[in-house]
């Protein structure tokens, strides 16, 4: 009986410790990718007390001890330690971080943020070269977000793949859908209702690749405790939808005097129908 009690006590002591270590694995992985093959003696602890986002760190007996409100805060705390001690930089142009073999002891430093959410990206950011990022590039970007304290990124990848399913269910043909979509580099302006059918169509291969990529992106963001902002129906529709709903009034928009698009009023019942379908398709795919 005494042996069993000792075993049970040891088990109860070890399980929370193991769970705590597992809980901080996403932050530890970010840190390891940032420093490459180097080693840093660091302990990570999430203390999710209610209140503002915060991180704190100190070095005691050569060990860097970081506490934070979540995994993003832990990453932000590590990067603050790196920058404050002139050990390097992690940037879009590359990273150059050199961790000393032995860390000098350092007193406690704590930072509390007055804001709950730290937003990142805008609609236009998703144009230019960003549509062509693969998972390796996205992983670096999400690491950059975590190290800089971002916890609410805009996540628009695969928007068109989902909307294509909606247009198809409504009765549009593949050609009508293809004639609506702009090419990858121009998608932000299509999403804002400025243009359509420029440098398109988007292929099924493109849609499938974007869906697979978005699964990885959202999974990593959520592992770190981020709250990605996903798209919804904004009211812009293919011109061909007038064939299906001739009784509905659509507004024609013009941009730069040369480009035209069609918009559905949010007061129209069809707006709510399409909006509901989009959310259902998105949740079916991504949860």
Question: Model-derived features: where do they sit?
Answer:
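Aromatic-lined carbohydrate-binding surfaces of glycoside hydrolases
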Residues: 34, 45-51, 60-72, 76, ...
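Bacterial Sec-dependent N-terminal signal peptides
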Residues: 1-23
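Extracytoplasmic soluble-region selector
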Residues: 38-43
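Glycine/proline-rich low-complexity spacer/linker segments in large multi-domain proteins
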Residues: 90-94
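Short N-terminal segments immediately surrounding and downstream of signal-peptide cleavage
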Residues: 22-37
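Short Gly/aromatic-enriched secondary-structure transition segments
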Residues: 80-81
């Amino acid at each position: 009986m005494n042996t069993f009690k000792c075993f049970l006590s040891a088990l109860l002591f070890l399980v929370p410790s193991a769970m705590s270590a597992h809980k901080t694995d996403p932050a530890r992985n970010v840190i390891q990718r940032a420093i490459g093959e180097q080693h840093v003696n660091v302990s990570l602890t999430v203390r999710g007390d209610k209140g503002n986002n915060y991180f704190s760190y100190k070095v005691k007996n050569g060990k860097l001890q970081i506490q934070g409100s979540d995994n993003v805060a832990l990453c932000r705390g590590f990067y603050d330690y790196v920058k404050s001690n002139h050990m390097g930089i992690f940037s879009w142009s590359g990273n150059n971080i050199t961790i000393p073999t032995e860390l000098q002891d350092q007193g406690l430093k704590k930072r509390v943020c007055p804001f709950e959410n730290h937003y990142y990206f805008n609609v236009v950011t998703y144009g230019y070269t960003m549509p062509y990022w693969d998972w390796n590039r996205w992983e670096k970007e999400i690491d950059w977000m975590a190290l800089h304290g971002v916890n609410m990124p805009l996540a628009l990848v695969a928007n068109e793949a989902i909307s294509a399913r909606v247009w198809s269910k409504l009765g549009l043909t593949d050609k009508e859908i293809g004639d609506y979509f702009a090419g990858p580099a121009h998608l932000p302006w299509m999403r804002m209702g400025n243009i359509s059918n420029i440098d398109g169509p988007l292929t099924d291969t493109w849609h499938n690749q974007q869906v697979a990529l978005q699964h990885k992106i959202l999974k990593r963001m959520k592992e770190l405790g981020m709250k990605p902002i996903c798209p919804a129906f904004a009211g812009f529709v293919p011109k061909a939808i007038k064939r299906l709903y001739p009784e509905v009034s659509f507004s024609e928009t013009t941009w730069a005097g040369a480009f035209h698009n069609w918009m559905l009023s949010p007061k129209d019942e069809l707006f709510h129908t399409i909006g509901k379908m989009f959310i259902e398709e998105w949740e079916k795919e991504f949860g």
